[in-house]
Structures are given as C-alpha cells and as structure tokens.
Amino acid sequence: MDRTSLKFRRNKMKRNIFSSALLIALLLPTIALAQVKVVITPQERKMAEAITAAQLRDYLYFIAADEMEGRDAPSKGLDITANFLAMMASRLGFKPAGDNGTFFQNIDVRVDSPDAEKTKLAVIGKQFKYGDDFVRVTGTGDASNRPLVYGGAGWLVKSKGIDDFKGIDVKGKIVVLSARGMPNMNNLTQRPAGVTPADLQGERGVEWADPLTYATKSGAAGIIVIANEQINGSWNQVRNAFGRTSLLWEKLRPDTARTALPVLLATTSVGNEIMNGISAGAVTDLKPNASMTVAIKSEKKKTRNVIALWEGRDPILKKEMVAIGSHYDHVGVNPNAPGDDKIWNGADDDGSGTVGVLSIAEALAKAPVRPKRSVLIVWHTAEEKGLIGSEYFNRFPTVDIKNVIANINIDMIGRSKKEGDTDPRNKDLSGPNGTFLIGAELMSSTLGAVTLGTNNAYLKLDYDRKYDDPADTNRFFFRSDHFHYAVNGIPAVFWFTGVHEDYHQPGDHADKIDYVKMEKISRTIFLTLWELTDLKERPKVDKQLPPELTRR
C-alpha cells in the first residue's frame, strides 16, 4: 500500500460516466440489498478449495525472497517477478492482454532520488547533516541567506475562517511549518481539525490552499517542516522512506519533483535551533536567516503492468469483465538503513495480494466450467510510487475499459493480530478470522450486496467496515490501486487486513504470514469474483459519490 501519499490526484480528468450513472441511479428506485441473494453451490465451494495455504506459502516465499531485492519499481527483482507472473498466467491458459499480444504493459518513467551530497541546510550559519538532521520532501532549488518566517501549519480554508499566513509576509522567505501528520508532496501537513474534503471547494489557491500551494502562491522561497514528536520518534523509518526513489510519469504528470518549491523535513532539534530565543506563539517573523539547497538525481527507465484475460463462457456476457488485481511492487533496498537487514521484502505489502490473485487465477483455470463473464487480472506496478501502474492502465487501457463492470483489489491480506499483542503498532491489525472490507458499498449497492452476501453464505469472515467512515483520517480507499478504477466509474472493493509493526519495514518477511487466514480470504474473494461474473446485469453506480471521485 502506498504510504507517502494519501495520494488522490486532482489531475483534471473528466469522468462523465460518474455524473451520468449517478443521475440514472437517482431516477430509478434504490436497489435493495435483499434483491441480490447469493447462494454458494457445492461445486463453487469445491472450486474455491483449489486455493490452499501451502500453495500461497510456496508462491510468497518466492515473491518475497531476498533475491527479489524488495521488488522496487523499477528493478531487476521486479522484472523477475513480472516474468514469473506472466509465465504462470500463460501456463494456466490465460490470454495475454497487454501491449502487442504480450502479458506486459510498458510504462516509461523517470526515476528520481535525493542527491544527499548536494542537498544542504544551514541555519544561522550552522550546517546540518542530510539524513541525520533533515531529509528532502519534494522540489529542487536554492534559497540562500533568506529570512525565516513561522507559518503554523500553512493552511488556507476560507469557508472555515482558517488562514495560517494571515498578517505574515512570506514572500522571498523560507517558511517554517509545524508538522501535523506525516508530510508528503500533496499535504505537507494534514488538514486542520474539522476540515473535510467537502470543505475544500472553490478555486484552489484562492478559496482554499494546502501548505505547498499557499506558500508557492505567496512567493515563499522554500519550506522547512519541523517534525513533531511522533515523527521524531521514528526518524530512522522517516529517513528511509524519504530516501527512496520516486517515479515521474513525465508525459502526463507535471514535473513537480523539479519545479515545486523546495521542501525539507527537519528534526525537532533543528526546529529548536530555528525557534531558539523566540517566545512560542508571541512572535511569528523570526530573526534568524537560513540557506537551503535541494537537489535530485534522475535517470530514464521502464516498468510494467502484468495483464492477463480469462475468457468467459457466455457468448454475450463474456465481452464484459470483472477486474481483479494487486500491486506486485514494494520499496526495494536501502543500503543506508540501520541494522543488518537492508531489504524490504514486502511479504505482506503486497506479496500477499500478489499471490492471492495468482491463487485465484489458478482456481479459475482448474474450475470445471468457465465463469459467464470474463476475468481480467492486472498485477500493477509502482503502487508504492504513487499508484502509477493503476493510473496508467486506467488512462491507457489495453482492453475496452467500458466493459469492466467491477474491480477487486487485494492489498495486504497476510497478517493477524495475536492474542496478548500489546504493541501499539499492531492495534489496528485484524484477527485470525477478520479483515477490513473497504468501499464495497461506496459506489454500488449491488457490489455491496454481492460482496457481503458471498461472505455470509460462505465462511462468514469478520468484515470490519470502520475504514469506510468518511471521517476516518487514514483514507485507505484513496491509497491503493482500486482508486483509479473508481475514478473511471468502475465500482471497486478492497480487502486489507491492517497495518502492523513491519509495515514498510525490513521485517515484512514471509515467515510472519498467517497462511490459513490468507487461504480463507482468498477463497472468499474467489467466490465473490465468481458471483460478480454471474450477475444478470452489471453493478450500477447508485450512491452519492465523495468529492475525490467527482472532481476530475
């Protein structure tokens, strides 16, 4: 799962299918959940039993082996994994559905990484050390010997009376912000308390502005975000996260990595240097000057989605597809990481989803009968770099995207909270019979009815729906690959067993996976997929959509 984003992109894509589908839905009677009755036949149960814990274990130990070097996008280990997935799809009898009759969809990207030697920060003449004292967040450029000005959290939300730069002249200065949540290039600080996405209406930069937009529009020379205690307490992880490469899809995304205002994240000790001698809250315009230089290194590379088609049996319905996918990349190797383990194996994130999809593909191939509709499998690349693979596929599909009736996404289904576990990092991890179900009823009543009905008729897993709460700050629905299908007007549902102590850490190993739980979840997803392929009519978008899915 993509950590650094909460990355829904306001990229101006217009998806008229949303508004038209929603209008039709409003004119028709609401579909009652009871109208979709799911019955699992003995034959279907037998088909699901082709998925086994042993099978999942064997595949995952290969996918998450040290030899794959953490499956960074792009990397040799990721290419090996892609070739393995394509080979397995071919052996199982799937049709290639990528570019030019292959299983691959190639994506040209630019790979950026921080230039630690050239990225510098000095405050009142004191030089700080990259990595130990500060890291790059985004942007490039120089801001030499500039005054510092404190700008709070940096937000403007006129409808809520919030203006953190009110009365402050930031032009030509380096703005100091107090961290609120983990910074990323879309939100350097989290939205103010009580502000929802629905409040961010009107022209961006005028009626409302995130800190980067507000500082840029106000003429600031650079930004330093000062870590809070939570960030400071996990500085090694923070340093590793911001030290990794990032990808730019040059032809279609703005080159914010180079053109954005230079932004650094600094430790609290650096913040103390900046705030030294200043009475907190009494003075905003600070006396000290600072100099910052932010630089990156770049190279051109390719990365690939892996796409396969299992054709349905119905002569009419087989033109329609249920898409099921996962991301097969992780975050690679960090030679500067503390300790002996430098490889982020990504067994749970998202090796578990990758092999879960593979096991479902194998169950389809072993079934005595084909589904009515076709099944499209997409193993997405570069989810960890900003949902790049899924966005690319949805903007440049290798199949007729209008015929994709639903999307199933599997991202992190391998871990269980053990009895007596008091580690706060595991507080939201699901139990041995549980999983979080996200988005099932967000867009379509029918998708929700099939998803919930299948579980009730089968293994009765404990589905936790808490992340569907619009007020939930994790915003998981907007952080994995199903999001771009939803943007395309395709109802999507997401299985996820929760974050844990090894999330985006080198300890995410295959020997920590609960394979019995993975088996249960994968079997349930297989049958959910099967029931969707068997529907008389495709699921309609009949729900009031959140702003992130309509402002395109």
Model-derived regions, located:
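N-terminal hydrophobic or amphipathic helices/low-complexity stretches enriched
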Residues: 34-96, 319-321, 542, 546, ...
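Soluble metallo-hydrolase cores and metallopeptidase-like ectodomains found primarily
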Residues: 38-44, 124-167, 251-346, 362, ...
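Noncatalytic luminal/extracellular "stalk/propeptide" segments of secretory-pathway proteins
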Residues: 69-189, 303
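Metal-dependent peptidase/peptidase-like ectodomains
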Residues: 126-129, 166, 252-254, 261-272, ...
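Extracellular/luminal Protease-associated
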Residues: 130-254, 259, 311, 342, ...
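Zn-dependent metallopeptidase/amidohydrolase metal-coordination segment
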Residues: 332, 472-519
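Short helix-loop-beta-strand segments that form the rim/entrance of peptidase-like active sites
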Residues: 361-388, 410
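His/Asp/Glu-rich mid-to-C-terminal helical/loop segments that flank catalytic regions of hydrolases
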Residues: 362, 366, 496-552
